[in-house]
Regions:
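Alpha-helical scaffold segments that form or flank carboxylate-/histidine-based iron centers
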Residues: 66-78, 102-111, 139, 144
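Glycine-rich beta->alpha junctions and the first turn(s) of the following alpha-helix
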Residues: 1-83, 148, 170-184
């Protein structure tokens, strides 16, 4: 590749884009993080639906699993996490469409992926031994949820490098203060 030339009109951003490829790539990561958050919401939805169906059909000690208070509590927590992440993802997507929300895209990815892990774990618990069997969809949802935390920036990298840094920068900005009049 030594001596390989590239004309300016082939460079992203033309001549103004020289040396900025990394920044162009990083700007594209926000969309990828939103897509990953959306995938996490899809996994949560599928796990919740499968759990509701299984809880209706599965009988334990003569009654449907759905009639046990602990099952209802698990399903309620699963639904709450799914709903919250879905609504947040929609809200942040609108902000991104308007040109903002870089840190927020990382936040929603963090929250949705972690929530997908929790929701699919609860789905596995509700399905018992059947949930762990590789041929069941719930087992696949659990595996899919785990890998989502790695896509588009590992959880720890996002938390430290993107979210914490953005929060720290915002906290350290001097607050705007009204100008003092000459008499005070």
């Amino acid at each position: 590749m030594d001596g390989l030339g590239l004309r300016c009109h082939h460079v992203g951003g033309e001549a103004g884009g020289l040396g900025k490829g990394f920044y162009f790539t990083m700007a594209g990561m926000m969309g990828g993080r939103m897509q990953t958050a959306a995938r996490a919401c899809g996994v949560m939805r599928a796990a919740l639906r499968a759990s509701l169906q299984y809880s209706r059909d599965r009988k334990v000690f003569g009654q449907p699993l759905l009639e046990y208070p602990l099952t209802l509590a698990k399903l309620a927590r699963m639904a709450a996490r799914f709903s919250a992440c879905r609504q947040l993802a929609f809200a942040i997507a609108r902000v991104l469409d308007e040109g903002g929300g870089r840190m927020e895209a990382s936040l929603v990815k963090l929250l949705a992926c972690r929530s997908a892990e929790m929701v699919t774990r609860e789905a596995l618990q509700l399905h018992g031994g059947m949930g762990y069997a590789e041929e069941t969809p719930v087992s696949r949802y659990f595996v899919d949820a785990r890998v989502l935390s790695i896509f588009e920036g590992a959880e720890e990298t996002l938390a430290l490098k993107v979210v914490a840094r953005s929060l720290l920068e915002a906290a350290l900005k001097p607050a705007s203060r009204p100008a003092l009049s000459a008499g005070t």
